[in-house]
Amino acid sequence: MADVTVKDIFKEMPNRFNADAAKDMDAVIQFNLTGDDAGQYHAIIKGGKLEVKEGTHPTPKMTMTMAGKDYVDLTLGKLNGQMAFMQGKLKIAGDMGLAMKMQTLFRNG
């Protein structure tokens, strides 16, 4: 099986989305991924619905910055988000409360 890429993760993001956890939410999350598997994506969450787009959003509520490989590992459950943050592998700008909700909004896998 081929290695999972950042593009694969964002393509599958709607399948991992927990609409019930986001039913009252209105937020944009920007993902700035660096390194070999780099890319910029944003997730628009509104009223329990998710839309994922490539590129940057002008007014995200929260921005996550990390290496593409680390983001893949985080999404697959191979890297703990809190540990990644403490080790400086994950940088968060904006709404830290939203960052804490990421595990309930998206299932690993």
Which residue ranges define each predicted feature?
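Feature captures hydrophobic
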Residues: 1-109
